[in-house]
Design a protein with these regions (language model features):
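N-terminal glycine-rich phosphate/pyrophosphate-binding loop and immediately adjacent elements
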Residues: 2-140
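Rossmann-like flavin
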Residues: 95-204
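A glycine-rich dinucleotide-binding beta-alpha-beta segment and adjacent secondary-structure elements
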Residues: 183, 187-199, 353-359, 418-489
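Helical element adjacent to the flavin cofactor pocket in flavoenzyme catalytic cores
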Residues: 214-263
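Beta-rich nucleic-acid/ligand-interaction surfaces
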Residues: 247-248, 252-268, 427-444
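Mid-domain catalytic core of redox enzymes
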Residues: 253-373
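Conserved FAD/dinucleotide-binding core of flavoprotein oxidoreductases
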Residues: 286, 308-310, 373-408
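A conserved FAD-binding loop/helix module that cradles the flavin
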Residues: 486-507
Length: 509
């Protein structure tokens, strides 16, 4: 029986962050990974066998990863900014095709785009005022994510923005969106950040939690492209972890843990037993042990579609595709469309009109393609469909996934000057290079419970009881057992935050 200071379940990015911090502090660390490869939902894969293109199959953008973690661990890794924040095509009252273009840094074309949509400057001014407040709020709350939990009163005082606290924390996000914005399309673009991976109405408080995490990342809320794809990020974490002596064992699914005040004993699927003073779970608790208390949560409600294109398709509006697809392209995501889709999804149905958003990784970072594919003009396209609950796939995952895929393509084709099918790359068997991953696929492939990309419902980033104040938000009902993955407080997204916080809980215990 081998003995360690710390055993970690799962070699996803959070597990590797925790392992790196602990090993750097001199701890003997073992990471047990159930799959044959490391990375979990942050791996890159050659999704289409005939082409040298390594796609981020599951997670695909990074906003929440603090610069402090990159600096602390000495990660040689780069996140790239996108010139365009978003583009939302629409058909105006004269049946003309147009679109709302929002640059990452506000400019005249963004100003003109808002005016063309709304006929006034008021919506653009409201946008700048609202996101200015949110960015200020983010800059004050972001550093606290790597500190012990404060009470809500302490955090409110620390941030010292009572009005923003009220509409971001206390009241449904839908209220402030409707109050501050008058255009249905603009309202929807704002609302999408509250719904990524979250089955909620605009007036459900889970939407607030999701919105908060999507907008506070690294104090700016900017969503960046990982250079080299998610796999490059994981490879760098692996390099750092192993350089400090971390031992990583793949194909080693944990089947049992015993924990008491003296430490933990872990048994893996190969019937090997390991002991340690501490145990950290990067995996969702239900996939590790029934002994770890679990809170009930919403099921996953998104579909991820990956594509390889011979070139980007032309749009009816005439906008340069390299602008339209560089940021997030919103489809069927007006406020009213999102609410209608939720009403259908919450009773287990696939929405008639699928809200979705997409972006092209290779416009910002072509390095995930071989030089040959780059020279030939190939591009990748990622689509993320909202309000597709796991329950809608249970009767037949394959059939339901096909239906959603068809809806997604149809929704995009409505705004294209040529069908998507004409620009999809084809493999040697004549099949289009497109794949779709439903919530049930995410559960089967990377152990996300019911396809919930956050493992559990996101929680607000402060202590919700007196007992939690001063703790790290990673504690469990078992002694010496901590959560270092997405289901920890302040977990969710590609952040490394719960990995850091679990490591701190060990080092300061």
């Amino acid at each position: 029986m081998s003995n360690y200071d710390v055993i970690i379940a799962g070699a996803g990015h959070n597990g590797l962050v925790a392992a790196s911090y602990l090993a750097k502090a001199g701890k003997k660390v073992l990471v047990l990974e159930a799959q044959e490869v490391i990375g979990g939902a942050t791996q890159s894969v050659k999704a289409f066998e005939d082409y040298e293109a390594r796609l981020s199959r599951y997670s695909y953008l990074i906003a929440l990863l603090p610069d402090k973690i990159i600096k602390d661990l000495g990660l040689n890794f780069q996140n790239l900014s996108r010139e365009i924040s978003s583009f939302t095509p629409y058909t105006n009252q004269s049946k003309e095709e147009s679109g709302l273009l929002v640059s990452r840094k506000w400019d005249s074309r963004t100003d003109d785009s808002f005016y063309q949509l709304t006929g006034s400057r008021k919506e653009a001014e409201a946008w700048q005022e609202f996101y200015g407040e949110v960015e200020k709020f983010a800059s004050r709350i972001a550093p606290t994510l790597l500190e012990p939990l404060k009470s809500s009163a302490e955090l409110n005082t620390h941030i010292s923005m009572p009005q923003a606290w009220d509409y971001l924390i206390e009241n449904p996000i839908g209220n402030v969106i409707v109050e501050k914005f008058k255009n249905d399309l603009v309202r929807g673009v704002v609302l999408t950040d509250a719904l990524i991976g979250t089955l909620s109405s605009a007036y459900g408080m889970q939407a607030n939690n999701c919105f908060l995490y999507h907008l506070i990342g690294n104090g700016t809320g900017e969503w960046k492209v990982p250079k080299g794809g998610m796999g490059a990020f994981v490879s760098e974490l692996n390099r750092v972890a192993t350089s400090h002596g971390v031992q990583i064992e793949c194909s080693s699914k944990i089947i049992d843990i015993d924990a008491d005040l003296n430490g933990v004993q872990v048994t893996d699927i190969n019937n090997r037993k390991f002991t340690a003073k501490y145990f950290l779970s990067n995996a969702a608790p239900e996939f590790v042990s029934s002994k770890i208390e679990n809170r009930s949560s919403l099921e996953g409600a998104q579909i991820k579609i990956n594509m390889l294109l011979k070139r980007l398709p032309r749009l009816k509006s005439g906008i340069d595709p390299k602008l339209a697809f560089a940021g997030t392209l919103h489809l069927n995501e007006s406020f009213s469309e999102l609410e209608r889709a939720y009403d259908q999804a919450v009773i287990g149905n696939i929405p008639d009109v699928l809200p979705s958003e997409m972006y092209c990784h290779t416009l910002t970072d072509p390095s995930i393609l071989s030089p040959e594919l780059q020279s030939e003009g190939f591009q990748t396209l990622t689509l993320f469909g909202l309000h597709t609950p796991a329950s809608a796939f249970e009767e037949s995952n394959k059939a339901s996934t096909k239906i959603v895929l068809e809806k997604a393509i149809s929704g995009l084709n409505n705004y294209l000057a040529e069908p998507l099918e004409e620009v999809l790359a084809m493999d040697k068997h004549g099949k289009p290079c497109i794949e779709a991953k439903s919530p049930l696929d995410l559960e089967a492939d990377v152990f996300l419970p019911r396809g919930n990309i956050f493992h559990k419902d996101l929680t607000l980033p402060f202590a919700e009881s007196d007992d939690e104040v001063g703790k790290w938000g990673v504690e469990t009902n078992l002694p010496n057992v901590f959560i270092c993955g997405a289901s920890a407080k302040r977990g969710g997204g590609v952040s490394g935050i719960p990995g850091h916080n679990a490591a701190m809980a060990v080092l300061y215990s």
